[in-house]
């Protein structure tokens, strides 16, 4: 128990005297370490959060599925539980957002200054966006007998969790400190400061409510002065029979200080039917009496209101007799807060107008604002009882579905643009997903390269200790590494390039699936030689290669990997093959001759690149198709060795492969397609060892034609879809199961916009930047602008 134990019952036996302080107004009395709150005489509450859904972006059939699943949730509510949904608009914390988005270190000169200006513009834009939603559920329970146990709340929570899981909404129980923070935000709507409890609270003799409560409460007829803010509690008096599922979202999808609380109590089916039968008897009795009275006067007419009510009751009786229909007592409360009385009146007018649009009547709670406020708070207690309730059947109660749009903010994430629906910043951490690997898909001119370069810049600024590697077939990314730009190294690879990579670079301590490092390296070298050969190796050829690889590493092994002078090279293997007695060995050496003593010897000697740089771009524009088939595999092997080395140091490695479709069409025209297969292997390995890999392509149809590439797309948790051409759009929509409303974001043709698919989330985004400044100048691929710059 967090509060010291008291004899609470005496308070209730006195009928709960009027609170003497602001702290006394907060409607809980004890809270326990397991998260349960005592909120009334023998009444206990468990509180948990649930995740919003992008309900409005779902397909029509998906919305219907969610609506039906929500009905099942309501139908499953125990009749001894008071169920409450609490949805509060929570202001964007600009300082927190700024802290998350701004660079961790001041570096890169003018780039840093311009980047910070871009971030600040987006922070200000987000401040005006739709507020994020705090979404809670409170389950309130009062034991009726001595054998009843309040721990049944946890059982009910687990049962509800299965329903929310089916709707793809994550739920988790709130611990007391989390609830306190939410209460503090409700009571201090315009403070916009983080709630913190001192670690020595009890040593000071303090009380938790001292840190939650506002400075004062002043309950007026139709509003409450809460500290320096003005709050008004209203309730829904009447619903339209044809109410649609957008009502709640239209109330809440803004940046006003609005909270909606919905209390639902399921009525026992037998009790409900008995009440309806009794109502029918009463109405039938009234009709019979009117007929008798009218007969005496020479007429036989009956008022329409009675016949209509009887028909409604008979329809209700018939529907309630069905297996999927329940009766609920529903109360809906709306809390509005503003900084001045005039602003409160304006906000009230706005909300009533929104409600009128849906034929919903909203009334004030006159001289009951205190009870109303305590009813709004997430403790599962309706302090106004049935006085403001409406009885609804399952389908009508479920139309008040709580889902609308998600907001996306991760403290550890990077900025992925502005949400095109909510206008708020999208901050995502790809590494939080089950599979952080991803793809960026967009035709030429869609803003693909600019998006990727901005993501690279975001990583460089946000994660200064991480390492970045780009495989660049079109000579696009070298501009990022220039004087006064980002610090890194461009490695140009071509037949005559001075840049060297040693195919034998190895970490002897590494093992995988029961294989030691040399066995794994031997398999890789077989793959390279097979690609160079143009068709599959025979088993005797593999044996010869494996033998020579092990001989080549012998002296390096004896030094336990410490003597780098003894590290073999492709030249070592070439010479060993020439020394073997088998004629096949001479043929294998002949295959390698082109790459050792011939025109393509970039991979014959020891690695000579500056390995201290944390940003490397492999420029393969001039590599040529003949060298590319082997070269891509060797580059990927080098990347893989870097990933292993970085993991030991606690460094994350980010890899971007532009036009990754070349991996599946490497120019070898061989039946082996080894580059694609090896890319699939390295791509999956990187994720398992703390890396983040991204494939980029404009040739989506070519990629989908490859089973391996298609499988990679399906399994990746992170995909960026930029505006698509019509012939690609249909295939993409089918592959990613996009709804028509989601598909519309890919039809706009607006550069730098589209959809981000991150796990279960599909987010419409806009990551355009203004066409000026150092950042834009560094990342722009606009040829006309380039011409103007050099002329």
Task: Go through the PLM ranges and name each one.
Residues 1-403:
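Extended, folded cores of ATP/NTP-driven motor/assembly subunits in large transport
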Residues 53, 60-79, 86, 90, ...:
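P-loop NTPase motor domains
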Residues 440:
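Hydrophobic anchor at the beta1->P-loop junction of P-loop NTPases
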Residues 448:
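Conserved lysine of the Walker
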Residues 451:
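Hydrophobic positions on the alpha1 helix immediately C-terminal to the Walker A/P-loop
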Residues 458-469, 488:
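Post-Walker A helix-loop "phosphate-sensing" segment adjacent to the P-loop in P-loop NTPases
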Residues 491-496, 718-727:
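Conserved AAA+ ATPase "SRH/arginine-finger" region at the nucleotide-binding site
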Residues 739-790:
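Conserved P-loop NTPase
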């Amino acid at each position: 128990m967090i509060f010291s134990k008291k004899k609470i019952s005496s308070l209730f036996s006195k009928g709960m005297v009027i609170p003497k302080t602001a702290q006394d107004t907060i409607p809980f009395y004890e809270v326990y370490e397991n998260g349960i709150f005592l909120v009334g005489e023998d009444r206990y509450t468990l509180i948990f959060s649930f995740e919003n859904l992008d309900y409005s972006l779902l397909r029509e059939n998906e919305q219907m599925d969610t609506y039906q699943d929500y009905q099942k949730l309501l139908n499953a509510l125990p009749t001894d539980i008071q169920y409450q949904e609490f949805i509060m608009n929570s202001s964007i914390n600009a300082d927190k957002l700024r802290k998350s988005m701004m660079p961790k270190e001041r570096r890169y000169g003018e780039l840093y200054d311009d980047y910070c200006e871009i971030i600040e513009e987006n922070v200000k834009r987000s401040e005006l966006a739709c507020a994020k939603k705090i979404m809670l559920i409170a389950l309130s329970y009062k034991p009726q007998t001595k054998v009843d146990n309040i721990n049944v709340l946890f059982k009910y929570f687990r049962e509800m969790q299965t329903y929310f899981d089916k709707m793809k909404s994550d739920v988790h129980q709130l611990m007391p400190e989390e609830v306190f923070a939410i209460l503090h935000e409700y009571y201090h709507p315009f403070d916009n400061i983080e709630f913190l409890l001192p670690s020595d609270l009890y040593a000071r003799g303090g009380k938790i409510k001292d840190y939650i409560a506002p400075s004062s409460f002043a309950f007026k007829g139709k509003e409450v002065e809460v500290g320096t803010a003005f709050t008004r509690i209203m309730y829904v008096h009447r619903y339209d029979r044809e109410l649609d599922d957008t009502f709640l979202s239209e109330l809440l999808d803004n940046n006003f200080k609005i909270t909606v609380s919905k209390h639902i109590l399921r009525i026992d089916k037998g009790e409900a039917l008995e009440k309806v039968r009794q109502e029918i008897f009463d109405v039938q009795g009234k009709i019979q009496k009117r007929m008798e009275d009218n007969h005496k006067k020479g007429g036989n007419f009956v008022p329409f209101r009675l016949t209509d009510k009887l028909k409604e009751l008979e329809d209700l009786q018939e529907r309630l007799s069905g297996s999927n229909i329940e009766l609920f007592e529903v109360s809906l409360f709306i809390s509005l807060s503003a900084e001045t009385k005039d602003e409160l009146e304006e906000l009230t007018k706005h909300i009533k107008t929104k409600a009128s649009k849906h034929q919903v009547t909203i009334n004030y709670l006159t001289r009951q604002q205190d009870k109303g406020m305590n009813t709004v708070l997430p403790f599962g207690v309706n302090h106004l009882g049935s006085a403001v309730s409406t009885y609804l059947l399952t389908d009508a109660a479920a139309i008040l579905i709580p889902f609308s749009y998600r907001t996306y903010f991760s403290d550890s994430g990077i900025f992925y643009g502005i949400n095109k629906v909510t206008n708020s910043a999208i901050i995502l951490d790809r590494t939080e997903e089950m599979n952080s690997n991803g793809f960026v898909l967009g035709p030429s001119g869609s803003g693909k390269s600019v998006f990727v370069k901005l993501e690279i810049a975001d990583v460089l600024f946000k994660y200064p200790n991480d390492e970045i590697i780009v495989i660049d077939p079109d000579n696009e990314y070298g501009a990022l590494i220039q004087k006064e730009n980002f610090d890194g190294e461009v490695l140009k690879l071509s037949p005559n390039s001075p840049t060297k990579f040693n195919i034998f670079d190895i970490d002897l301590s590494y093992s995988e699936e029961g294989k030691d490092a040399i066995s794994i390296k031997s398999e890789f070298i077989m793959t390279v030689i097979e690609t160079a050969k143009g068709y599959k190796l025979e088993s005797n050829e593999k044996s010869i290669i494996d033998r020579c690889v092990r001989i080549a590493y012998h002296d390096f092994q004896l030094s336990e990997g410490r003597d780098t002078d003894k590290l073999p090279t492709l030249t070592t293997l070439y010479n060993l093959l020439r020394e073997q007695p088998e004629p096949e060995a001479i043929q294998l050496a002949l295959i390698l001759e082109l790459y050792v003593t011939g025109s393509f010897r970039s991979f014959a000697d020891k690695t000579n690149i500056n390995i201290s740089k944390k940003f490397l771009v492999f420029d393969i524009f001039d590599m040529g198709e003949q060298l590319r088939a082997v070269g891509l595999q060797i580059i990927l092997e080098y990347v893989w060795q870097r990933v292993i080395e970085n993991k030991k140091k606690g460094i994350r490695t980010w890899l971007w492969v532009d036009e990754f479709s070349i991996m599946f069409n490497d120019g070898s025209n061989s039946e082996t397609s080894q580059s694609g297969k090896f890319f699939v292997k390295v791509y999956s390995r990187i994720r398992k060892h703390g890396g983040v890999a991204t494939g980029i392509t404009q040739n989506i149809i070519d990629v989908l034609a490859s089973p391996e590439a298609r499988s990679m797309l399906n399994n990746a948790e992170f995909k960026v879809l930029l505006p698509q051409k019509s012939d690609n759009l249909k295939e993409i929509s089918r592959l990613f199961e996009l709804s028509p409303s989601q598909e519309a974001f890919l039809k706009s043709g607006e550069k730098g916009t589209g959809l981000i698919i991150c796990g279960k989330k599909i987010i419409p985004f806009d990551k355009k930047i203004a066409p000026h400044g150092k950042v834009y100048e560094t990342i722009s691929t606009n040829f006309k602008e380039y011409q103007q710059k050099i002329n």
